[in-house]
Amino acid sequence: MTLNINIDNFQGPFDLLLHLIRKNKMDIYDIKIFDITNQYIQYLNEMKEMDLEITSEFIVMAATLIEIKSKYLLPKTKEEEEEKEESDPTKELVSKLVEYKKFKLAADFLKNRELDYGEVFSKKPEIIDDRTEDADNKDILKDITLLDMYKLFEKLMEMYRSRINTNNSLPDKIAPDIYKIEDKMDEISEIIKSNKEIYFSNIINKCSNKIEVVVTFLALLELIKLKDIKVYQSNNFKDIYIERVSAVE
């Protein structure tokens, strides 16, 4: 029988034994020691012919298998039969194989987990400072008059009304995109040239709809990628501060 051997596929003698057991469709608890020993020796001989280095672990396992096989072949006295029942070398080998199989399955599981999550990037947890005391609403509204609140409410309502779609009917034709990232990049660049620095909210407040806001934001990302501008944000959800690179440098 021709054997195709790759020693790298076996991480030790127990790995080779498990391969032979699977190949012969044997129960690990009912190993046919004669067949396994012969095939194991065949593997080692094939490795020699291929000039592969055979480690001492493989040779020790071969010697163990031959010893077990010889004990089955040689005639035994009654005392030896009783001694065999007490200390069966095959049982000891099977016990080690079972343990090795458990560790191999665990190693394969961990390897697959590494492959699955090797390209996954997780966000580090944020450290949220404990609030020592609750904010007092009176302090928050201390310098705000009723007129200020009314003006703020009117401003919010105006922003809300400007974004409502008043057209209840669907158009027969969908118009092509009127907003292009390249145009918005030029527009932002011109604004920065004049002002050197500006808040992102000042730009998007001029947008007429959500699509224009999205295109404007993508244009901002492209300018950052090209290193034409720098952006800063003091905290999460705060306004984005835009600054021209040349103004910094």
Swiss-Prot record:
Q: Where located?
A: Cytoplasm
- UniProt keyword annotations, A-Z: Cell cycle, Cell division, Chromosome partition, Cytoplasm
Recorded hits in Gene3D superfamilies, A to Z, give:
6.10.250.2410, Structural maintenance of chromosome 1. Chain E
Q: Name one GO cellular component term.
A: cytoplasm
GO term, biological process aspect, one: DNA replication
Kindly state the subunit structure of this protein.
Answer: Component of a cohesin-like complex composed of ScpA, ScpB and the Smc homodimer, in which ScpA and ScpB bind to the head domain of Smc. The presence of the three proteins is required for the association of the complex with DNA.
Quote the NCBIfam families the UniProt record gives: PRK00104.1-3
Function noted in UniProt: Participates in chromosomal partition during cell division. May act via the formation of a condensin-like complex containing Smc and ScpB that pull DNA away from mid-cell into both cell halves.
HAMAP family of this UniProt entry?
Answer: ScpA
Protein family according to the UniProt entry = Belongs to the ScpA family.
Q: Please report the name of this protein according to its UniProt entry.
A: Segregation and condensation protein A
**Gene designation:** scpA
